[in-house]
Amino acid sequence: MSRRGTAEEKTAKSDPIYRNRLVNMLVNRILKHGKKSLAYQIIYRAVKKIQQKTETNPLSVLRQAIRGVTPDIAVKARRVGGSTHQVPIEIGSTQGKALAIRWLLGASRKRPGRNMAFKLSSELVDAAKGSGDSIRKKEETHRMAEANRAFAHFR
């Protein structure tokens, strides 16, 4: 047995302007090459664009989008008897939020558009409405889990 203690679970800090953890999680995922100030600029511009498009609280749109994209279940490859099965597993809330943010950013990067702030704001508004590539990704994951339900006992 290890003599070391268990590592404390880190909680996400909140960002300086909105005091919101989800915004900070988004910033940390969008971050490239250590340029955090640029990541903050992109997020804050996207939030302003959401405010202009929807004329509602942009943080509620962000929360609604992330809640809509967060998966309940996913599939994990598991090797059993020489063949690999896709085994459906339940996902916790923290991991689900992380996946949702990753999917939202991936879908917004693939969008055609002027800049990342514009693409991200469009994807967040679409996800809050229940459409967009990130919602499709979640539904595809749920379909895969449903199709492989027979392998659920391999956990």
From Swiss-Prot:
Entries under InterPro entries matching the protein: Ribosomal_uS7, Ribosomal_uS7_bac/org-type, Ribosomal_uS7_CS, Ribosomal_uS7_dom, Ribosomal_uS7_dom_sf
Cross-referenced Pfam families: Ribosomal_S7
Keyword rRNA-binding: yes
Ribosomal protein keyword on record: yes
UniProt keyword annotations, A-Z: Chloroplast, Plastid, Ribonucleoprotein, Ribosomal protein, RNA-binding, rRNA-binding
GO annotation (BP), single: translation
One GO CC term on file: small ribosomal subunit
Location in the cell: Plastid, Chloroplast
GO molecular function, one term: rRNA binding
Disulfide feature: none
Transmembrane segments: none
Subunit and partners: Part of the 30S ribosomal subunit.
HAMAP family from the UniProt entry: Ribosomal_uS7_B
Function: One of the primary rRNA binding proteins, it binds directly to 16S rRNA where it nucleates assembly of the head domain of the 30S subunit.
Family statement drawn from the similarity comment of this UniProt entry: Belongs to the universal ribosomal protein uS7 family.
Protein name: Small ribosomal subunit protein uS7c
